[in-house]
Amino acid sequence: MIHAHSNARLLRWAILAIAPATLGACAPNGPPGLPYPDGKPLIPINTAAPEQGSSCQTRAP
């Protein structure tokens, strides 16, 4: 039987593992389109050029 707590941890791990690969390493505080912790909005993902994501990924370790 799968417990809800384990399911939530697995889902969170999957999101953390997949998000950087799909969104690129450009956003230091979260995926594009979501606000920074201090309230400054990021550039919406639909306005970001795909070339920016690929160039940021090459700079990521």
Curated annotation (Swiss-Prot):
The keyword Signal applies. Keywords: Signal. Residues 1-25 form the signal peptide. Residues 29-61 are annotated as: Disordered. The keyword Signal applies. Residues 52-61 have a biased composition (Polar residues). This is Type IV secretion system protein PtlI homolog. It comes from Bordetella bronchiseptica (strain ATCC BAA-588 / NCTC 13252 / RB50) (Alcaligenes bronchisepticus). The lineage of its organism: Bacteria, Pseudomonadati, Pseudomonadota, Betaproteobacteria, Burkholderiales. The gene is ptlI.
